[in-house]
From Swiss-Prot:
Assembly and interaction partners: Homotrimer.
Lineage: Bacteria, Pseudomonadati, Pseudomonadota, Alphaproteobacteria, Hyphomicrobiales
Family from the record: Belongs to the transferase hexapeptide repeat family.
UniProt xrefs under HAMAP family: DapD (MF_00811)
Record's protein name: 2,3,4,5-tetrahydropyridine-2,6-dicarboxylate N-succinyltransferase
Entry coiled-coil feature ranges: none
Length: 281
């Protein structure tokens, strides 16, 4: 089915989603399955960067991901420790893969790495024991470290390092208009969280424990400029706090958490955050 027809069919089905069930067959199911297949192979993306640097969200692909939950029934998924199983609607991306399939894909997936079908993993990616949700896109030479989560439809660029325990939010619950986007050459520090459609621009560095949502104030301590929803290119960001406003009794109120841009990336920063090509051979 041509892309334009896919989009039309999926948009129409989403408007009538209450009528979609696991018993639904025909054009709608075929369109959703085809859309998820395009996402799985990296031939389509939920969000794409235009030449002007703006990100365009393909809402119809996000709708296809959501519709798949209406179309697919629960089933037993084998492979748990101790011969246990799981009970879910979304199969593993790696279901049925053999050695040749992994070699062709060209990335590493160590034991404990979970990737759901319709997520795309590019060549030379390293997946430590982590979780990549459906519809996500992880580009070349990125490291997804231990206990990281890459949320539904999140877009991760090339040569990104997502450190241990960091979380990249998804779009499905709570429902978000746009996915989290981490552009090329970014470093996300351990136990940090980026959610609610925040964009981290090229080359930015988040230190350990930075929490960013759509309403988080990101303060440039050099200029005083405040950003929200977007980290500028090559910014080095640390956790911070804004002074509290006076309370009704005149006392100083509680401070408010924020993020602080302390500098722009320099060679010293690069030496601490650069990727190790030996891990990607």
């Amino acid at each position: 089915m041509p892309t334009a027809s896919l989009e039309t069919t999926i948009n129409g089905a989403f408007d009538a989603r209450e009528t979609i069930t696991p018993a639904t067959r025909g054009e709608v199911r075929d369109a959703v399955d085809q859309a998820l297949g395009l996402l799985d192979k990296g031939e389509a993306r939920v969000a794409e960067r235009a030449a002007d640097g703006k990100w365009q969200v393909n809402q119809w692909l996000k709708k296809a991901v959501l519709l798949s939950f209406r179309l697919n029934d629960m089933s037993v998924i084998p492979g748990g420790p101790g011969n246990a199983a799981w009970w879910d609607k979304v199969p593993s991306k790696f279901e049925g893969w053999d050695e040749n399939r992994f070699r062709d894909a060209g990335f590493r997936a160590v034991p404990g790495a979970i990737v759901r079908r319709s997520a795309f993993i590019a060549r030379n990616v390293v997946l430590m024991p982590s979780f990549v949700n459906l519809g996500a896109y992880v580009d070349e030479s990125t490291m997804v470290d231990t206990w990281c989560t890459v949320g539904s439809c999140a877009q991760i660029g090339k040569r990104v390092h997502i450190s241990g325990g960091a979380g990249i939010g998804g779009v499905l619950e709570p429902l978000q208009a746009g996915p989290v986007i981490i552009e090329d050459d970014c470093f996300i520090g351990a136990r940090s969280e980026v959610a609610e459609g925040v964009i981290v621009r090229k080359g930015a560095v988040l230190s350990m424990g930075v929490f960013l949502g759509a309403s988080t104030k990101i303060v440039d301590r050099t200029t005083g400029e405040i950003f929200m929803g977007e980290v500028p290119e090559y910014a080095v960001v640390v956790p911070g706090a804004l002074p509290g406003k006076p309370l009704s009794n005149g006392q100083l109120g509680p401070s408010t958490a924020c993020a602080v841009i302390v500098k722009r990336v320099d060679e010293r920063t690069r030496s601490k955050t650069g990727i190790n090509e030996l891990l990607r051979d």
